[in-house]
């Protein structure tokens, strides 16, 4: 009797967000977990989410710079793996808190800290199970002009200023104003 393959549905990073799913404004960051600048940006994002609440949706997309941060790729994969169990944001914040210690064994410990009980977590990391999802993020980032993280977009427009609370707030406020000015869609007969 031939063995049957198990079909596994993978939740992509594009489907992992926090905030209001139907918000008219999406803040998207391309970042990585070993970068000091990305860690600072993560703190700014926390302030932004506190300020805007359900007026926006935030997505983090992976852009590990493996030439200078060798462990950033596996860290990104571990975040995607955590997302499969609904623990992406818990793992995301733990990775930034521990950005100087992102070896595979540490990632396994952080997964427990995030509340992940998946016995296959380490196997998935070692086997690169979620590597394609991270590579897809990198590819899309390159297509959008991302060169070095952190890079932010508000409704698909790159924020070219330094990602401070003030600069991101201005970009979000502008997008919120634009979304209010749009005429209501006409119903088809």
Specify the residue positions occupied by each region the protein language model found.
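Alpha-helical interaction segments
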Residues: 7-8, 20, 78, 111, ...
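Short coil/turn segments at beta-strand junctions that form active-site/ligand-binding loops
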Residues: 23, 54, 148
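Structural alpha/beta surface segment adjacent to cysteine/selenocysteine redox centers
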Residues: 28-113, 117, 173, 182-186
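Short clusters of hydrophobic/aromatic residues that line enzyme substrate/ligand-binding pockets
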Residues: 17-18, 102, 159
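C-terminal cap of thioredoxin/glutaredoxin-like
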Residues: 26, 30, 37-47, 109-189
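A short beta-strand-turn-helix
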Residues: 8-25
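N-terminal targeting signals for export/organelle localization
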Residues: 1-7, 186-189
